[in-house]
């Protein structure tokens, strides 16, 4: 029998697939490599299973040819880049996506089912590998089960209820009608994915060696369950107004069963979500917490905490009780820029190295320094960031005032960041996450990796007549006067001698997400619950101290005062606070697209007019709130069908029992 190396086999199995037969598997092997050879031994089986991950796109692909619409399909991003170049989030909001032409979004359907088919082949044939020990078999099957569950999870995020194949191995010689089947209900889908992840977690390791960073762990399985349970408890899937409006008349045509229960609210779902989050929070490694928020200790460049904060009695205590003793800008920023060691970041419940994120830094980088300069943030995002003492821009203090007139008089330096003199006062005195994420006119760009004169330590502006302004390009400019800089390291450069970029990691699940989902879930409880997950039972209730403890870890890490009992006075008040916090904390991580949908506020947020600075003006009239002068603003489509993506029409027509998503063509 032919010897197949891990590298060759993995590369073959990770190749892109173009077949329309979404339940075929043999199409993906050349005549040189037979499926029987895969199960000849342990080594080949391992390579085969890891080859499945090649079907799943780099999760850090947020903007271009992405599996999900991402930031460009929300109120956190806008661009003038041509949609023909794969900016399909813009295609979606401009009404250019259809079931007959879903562009890259069809990848979720085709590649996920390719992955599921492969996993089922492993379940059916793994015993053919005679050199597997019982432990080998258990570990490989757990990994296989996780990958299959993750593929179903991606399908659920994109389309809602899925077609469940179970463990059935699908031969490639079946006629189309032999594998036609209806979609499961939403409840059946969620329960199946979660049960599969629970089973997978039993034999997944808690950690891997550093060289194997990115492989799914027990915590990754538990973290996915926590996210799925939180989404499932949210209004879109749990009797909210959006559920009734979007899914009230959505019945399975094969038996007239409703896909989504829209007329009943189940509070216990929030309790299960809270317990699932708590399980991740309780995980230990050598007696210490398995996961924690990433922090950097303060040093001589760390600015002092803001004075006069009285709303949070713990604020001046050392972190994690309060906000003292850490550098808030670096603690947030360095896990995205590549400064932090990706493989040892304790905040990654599950993460992977992402070359796409490295490449995407070019989208926010100034065009005059080798970038494309057009991945814009909106004024809404800029306004959402608090002042340095945690107050909103509408309620700023005398010590840290907010102003939309005038410019700063002196340069400030803090945490390795330089805030130039002459910066618009709107951008002064803001919280540290603002400086980590927002590129604005008169921002200082270090670009320290290059040694070429004039290519580093530069100030960039977006005035109409500046080198990075609108007059220089029809598409490669910021239509709002802001760009995303969250993933850009001070050393990163795209032009000049020795220009290079730091490696980046993409957090598929961050511990900050677990903490905020936990706080959110507890907030919606009106009584105490005892929830059993595996062998453990978790007691959950709307305990104000528990909510504050989890939520304030995130707040204090960013240098902001924690919430008070007044903020928790009622469920709705805290929900609004949490929505803003998630918008800031997870900016351009792909979370907001799903958040506004699960909360049922997608239409509300999308109906708000995109605004920014006046990029048609020179410096004298640039600094005024303006609707970008582009037809794309008026062309934005807001429709309830956009809560879910369309299943590709060619797949729907091959499967007569499979219903299309509401309001999409079938």
Labelled PLM ranges:
Residues 1-30:
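Bacterial Sec-dependent N-terminal signal peptides
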Residues 19-22, 112-115, 192-194, 256, ...:
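Long, intrinsically disordered, low-complexity segments
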Residues 20-70, 297-298, 425-428, 650-666:
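Membrane-proximal, proline-rich intrinsically disordered regions
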Residues 37, 42-60, 82-159, 176-218, ...:
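Conserved, well-structured interaction surfaces
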Residues 156-157, 161-163, 228-240, 524-528:
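Short coil/turn linking the two alpha-helices of tandem helical-hairpin repeats
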Residues 172, 179-183, 187, 236-274, ...:
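Acidic, serine/threonine/proline-rich low-complexity intrinsically disordered regions
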Residues 364-490:
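Long, low-complexity, polar/charged, intrinsically disordered or flexibly structured peripheral segments
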